[in-house]
Amino acid sequence: MEANRSRLLAAARPYIQIYSIFGLTPPIQFFTRTLHKRRRGIVILGYACYLISISLMVIYECYANIVALQKDIHKFHAEDSSKVMGNTQKVLVVAMFVWNQLNILLNFRRLARIYDDIADLEIDLNNASSGFVGQRHWWRFRFRLALSVGLWIVLLVGLTPRFTLVALGPYLHWTNKVLTEIILIMLQLKCTEYCVFVLLIYELILRGRHILQQISVELEGNQSRDSVQELCVALKRNQLLAGRIWGLVNEVSLYFTLSLTLLFLYNELTILQIVNWALIKSVNPNECCQYRRVGTCLLLSINIFLSCLYSEFCIQTYNSISRVLHQMYCLSAAEDYLILKMGLREYSLQMEHLKLIFTCGGLFDINLKFFGGMVVTLFGYIIILVQFKIQFFAQSNFMQNINSTELKAYTA
């Protein structure tokens, strides 16, 4: 993969470099053909050692956070679901980072194919649109990427410490708090990495649809036999490109399957844990973290929402290709030329068969419907948790009243 032969990958390169610094994805230089073989091996070995050191740091910090959690639980006498959820939360963090390193190792070739497919598709789409007017400009994608992902990364990095630093509690050393904040940011950046690839696919779909719309315009204005034959060739080429984009979506979904599954599970469990501790500490009149907890819940929810929203954009744009084909099918040229009519029918059948789905290994689809279902499920668990806590507090107060009554009777 040569990043300089793809303007889309060149626009996404700064974001990929950020993710590689945090150990989330290999540096894009690993996939270039200009790097000397021996030097490339040394760089890969050095980066592997860097990833191992990150994993060791994550394991140590999770251990330190578990120790601090036990002290918090003992202080507030909350040895119920809080301990289970807290320990599960920390184990999920370790699992995500360990799997991320394994994913880099096991799916290195798949990621290389994804980069190659993106670059090849961009070149082929540019070649296919060379005979038409009104081509899309690459700088629009750079602006969309900065607005959709770059701005959110800035907000994540800036707001995560502000919302979560105080909530880490008094039992962690300041160095542990700083490293924990870095780990929390790294976790959420994995979702933005997925968003970058989704937006790359979205741009490819937009270009493919734009070419199809130009073919439709040409069919309306020019219906000579030679022109229609040339447009049928362009239509077939566009059909093949749409099929390749569908295959690219499957590759990206497979690459992010377990990473996103663990991240979504972690975010949902973290929101439940935040609500749990908000209920536990609600009896404290000096509690100052309630609004920050709301901010943390919003950050985690918006991070999932954006990945679902951008995936939904891709799906809706891909599905709009069928509407363009239907409009072309209604043109008089489709009635006059059988080859065009058969080409449109074949393309339409392909679109019906190759449905665009962003999925996590078949466990769930990443779209707005999934996000809505996740929110409803999360609210259901929160209601159950609140009911459980109210019952627990009522029993605790009742037992305290009985003990105080017995103590007064005994002293009397």
Swiss-Prot record:
The keyword Transmembrane helix applies. One of its GO terms (biological process) is signal transduction. The keyword Glycoprotein applies. It comes from the Eukaryota. Residues 1-7, 62-148, 203-244, 316-369 are cytoplasmic. InterPro entries: 7TM_chemorcpt (IPR013604). It holds the Pfam family 7tm_7. Keywords: Cell membrane, Glycoprotein, Membrane, Receptor, Transducer, Transmembrane, Transmembrane helix. Its main location: membrane. Glycans are attached at residue 403. One of its GO terms (cellular component) is dendrite. The chain crosses the membrane at residues 8-28, 41-61, 149-169, 182-202, 245-265, 295-315, 370-390. Residues 29-40, 170-181, 266-294, 391-412 are extracellular. It is a multi-pass membrane protein. It is found in: Cell membrane. One of its GO terms (molecular function) is ligand-gated monoatomic ion channel activity. Probable gustatory receptor which mediates acceptance or avoidance behavior, depending on its substrates. Belongs to the insect chemoreceptor superfamily. Gustatory receptor (GR) family. Gr2a subfamily. This is Putative gustatory receptor 98d. It comes from Drosophila melanogaster (Fruit fly).
